[in-house]
């Protein structure tokens, strides 16, 4: 009987193998990690971690408020805007505070940044939940990130800025906010100009490679706020010109969303 079952299974597997390529019939392996601190991963080589009781020496060195015994961490190689906007959603949804946001020069050889975000919480369950929300929201905010071998374009939107966006870019709390980030940097100026001409928005700041607003990345990043409709209109205008300009540098390469566009 066992021999018969084995033969049947062999035939079934042969048929599956013949009818579907390996990439279609084999799902990607979920990340395996036995560390209790590990929460998960997301697009952009993003890792989520939680530490229930941070060592007091590390706590002091990071200048974290003593009341926050637990911390949540989002760290990635590619992307700052997606993870920061995702962190803003995480703070809205949990009893946590964003303690640290830093953007190292990275993108794994590209023109932009990576990101380090640290949440503080009095209860480890809140820290873990914040990391979970941020990991869930990160792919959403990669929806309007486009790239080719010559550079990248990033557009982010929220209808209601919260404490993370206020901390990082001085976004007015509760206001709609958008950001434009483009590499090479000149395309960022072109996109910013198109955005502000297209809609009635207020510019918070413009970060260039040398004015301290970026980690010497080959980008110009523009941050602005206004009514929800105006912010979206500005972003759509910037996206239209940005895509056309970046395409000229590598005409043979397709410029498409990293996930699914969400600014519509």
Features from the language model and the residues they span:
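A structural signal for small-residue-enriched, beta-sheet-centric alpha/beta enzyme cores
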Residues: 2-17, 25-79, 102-114, 121-122, ...
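N-terminal low-complexity, intrinsically disordered segments
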Residues: 83-91
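A glycine- and small-aliphatic-rich helix-loop capping segment at beta-alpha/alpha-beta transitions
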Residues: 92-93, 123
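Conserved, well-folded catalytic cores of nucleic-acid-processing
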Residues: 93, 137-140, 198
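Long, hydrophobic/aromatic-enriched structural stretches that serve as scaffold segments
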Residues: 93-101
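Short amphipathic alpha-helices in soluble, non-transmembrane regions
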Residues: 128-137, 234-241
């Amino acid at each position: 009987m066992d021999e018969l079952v084995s033969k049947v299974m062999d035939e079934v597997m042969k048929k599956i193998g013949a009818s579907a390529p390996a990439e279609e019939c084999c799902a990607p392996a979920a990340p395996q990690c036995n560390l209790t601190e590990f929460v998960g991963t997301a697009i952009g080589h993003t890792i989520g971690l939680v530490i229930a009781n941070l060592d007091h020496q590390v706590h002091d060195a990071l200048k974290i408020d003593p009341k926050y015994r637990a911390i949540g961490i989002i760290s990635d190689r590619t992307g700052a805007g997606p993870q920061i906007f995702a962190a803003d959603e995480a703070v809205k949804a949990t009893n946590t505070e964003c303690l640290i946001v830093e953007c190292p020069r990275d993108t794994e050889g590209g023109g932009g940044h990576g990101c380090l975000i640290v949440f503080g919480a009095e209860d480890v369950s809140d820290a873990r939940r914040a990391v979970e929300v941020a990991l869930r929201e990160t792919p959403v905010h990669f929806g309007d990130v486009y790239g080719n071998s010559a550079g990248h374009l990033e557009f982010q939107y929220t209808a209601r800025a919260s404490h993370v966006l206020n901390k990082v870019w001085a976004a007015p709390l509760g206001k709609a906010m958008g950001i434009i980030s483009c590499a090479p940097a000149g395309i960022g100026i072109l996109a910013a100009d198109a955005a502000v001409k297209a809609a009635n928005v207020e510019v918070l700041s413009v970060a260039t490679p040398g004015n301290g607003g970026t980690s010497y990345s080959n980008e110009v990043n523009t941050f602005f706020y206004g009514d929800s409709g105006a912010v979206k209109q500005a972003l759509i205008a910037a996206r239209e010109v940005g895509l056309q300009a970046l395409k000229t540098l590598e005409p043979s390469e397709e410029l498409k969303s990293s996930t699914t566009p969400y600014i519509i």
